[in-house]
Amino acid sequence: EGEIVGFLGPNGAGKSTTMNMITGFIEPTSGRIIVDGYDISKKPRKAKRQIGYMPEGVPLYSDLTVKEFVTYMAELKGIPSKEKKEKVKKVLDATGLAEVSNKLTKNLSRGYKQRVSMAGALVGDPKVIILDEPTVGLDPKQVTEIRALIKELGKEHTVILSSHILSEVSQICNRVIIINKGEIVAIDTPENLENKVVNENSVYVTVEDPENKMENIKEKLEKVKEIKLVNENEDKTKKYIIKAENEVDIRKEIFETLAKEGITIFEMKKADATLEDAFMKLINTEEPIPNEESKKEGGEE
């Protein structure tokens, strides 16, 4: 509760199947899915009332107003009539839709349509919110607004966010689950996953080297493991990545050695890993990579 979890995997990994099982659209062939204490196979109605699902593609009824659509979703969820009006108003206010509540959904911008779909998922105050690609197709301003809304939701709900935009997941998620070929290959914070990729200290340097001295500079750098040309720029400068052992800061040695050799440094910066780097490494690994959380949980999934 109060956590935003990123759910990642390459195409065909099983993300959609997993979400369809959690939301009760597909019956699992084995194992159990427990939502707030309810087994979705044995008590589907009670389990589904704990879930708000916003599918990709924003499926709305174009002939309904915003308020009518959210009210209809409240009726489908079995919210009592005496509570319905108040709960609909609550989610319209929370999602910033009060001012457009009487507009037909077909006349809204894509950003507002995303909000309406999210309001439909939120009505009834479910414990778990599942969002499938909530910012796809939005302009930068709309993306910022939806991300801010998701962060607010994460304060009171468990939010499961499926997205192909890894920078988005890194920014707003507390934890990340990565699956590949139907198997969980990692469960950790974005920061820890990024740190696991950096098993060596790497530095990018952009230099002016007309005499190609960089080709033989490695033997003069004691702590350096590898030097690799990244690209040659139009201004005839060259960008290299220089790798050393983990926890070794090689920037001073690089600066002093290159200066001594007469190689002009235009730029030098540490190469930081991203969630995308971690994702690519994990999905290209044959065996699931163990992590501290999975070791602690250890039991039945």
Where are these regions (language model features)?
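A generic structural signal for secondary-structure junctions
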Residues: 52, 78, 177, 195-199, ...
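Conserved beta-strand edge residues that scaffold enzyme active sites
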Residues: 88, 106, 235, 272-273
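An acidic, carboxylate-rich microenvironment
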Residues: 30, 46, 68, 83, ...
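Surface-exposed charge patches
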Residues: 72, 90, 219, 256, ...
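ABC transporter nucleotide-binding domain
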Residues: 148-161, 165-245
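C-terminal coupling/interaction segments
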Residues: 245-301
